[in-house]
Amino acid sequence: KGVLHGIAAALPVFEEKDSGQFVNISSVGDRWVGPTSTVYSATKFAVRAISDGLRQEVSRNIRVALIAPGATESELPNTISDPELKKMAIETFRKETISGLAIAKAVAFAIAQPEDVDVNELVVRPTAQKNL
């Protein structure tokens, strides 16, 4: 719901100014569904669909960017309920993660574009991450 609440709060201001930029954060999980990740992937796909629909519905002066991080240093592996998958995810994350700073730089890249350029989607993942 956070993405929807953010849009609801900012959209009237952006429409009044006829200018603004949304930057929504999804995940590479919006492109892939695996065992035990169905609900997670569904929520991330929803963010992707909302972002794409919003981009098509708003004024041409309002930009909508979607950043889809791959394996990023976070608490995500700790939320996995299956013990085997959790152990595997933690081991993988130790070897194949990028920092939050890398994601912040992707956001900065999207924002820094000229006003007539909209970075619709940007997937950012570690070079070591081959799946997802």
Identify the meaning behind each predicted range.
Residues 7, 43:
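Active-site helix of classical SDR
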Residues 9-18:
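A short helix-coil junction within the Rossmann-fold of NAD(P)-dependent oxidoreductases
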Residues 12, 52, 56-60:
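Alpha-helical segment proximal to the catalytic Tyr-Lys
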Residues 20-22, 48, 58-72, 118-121:
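Conserved Rossmann-fold SDR core element
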Residues 27:
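Residue(s) in the substrate-gating loop at a strand-loop-helix junction
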Residues 32-38:
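Active-site loop immediately N-terminal to the catalytic Tyr-X3-Lys motif
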Residues 66-67, 86-132:
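C-terminal helical subdomain
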Residues 71-80:
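Short beta-loop-alpha junction of Rossmann-like oxidoreductase domains
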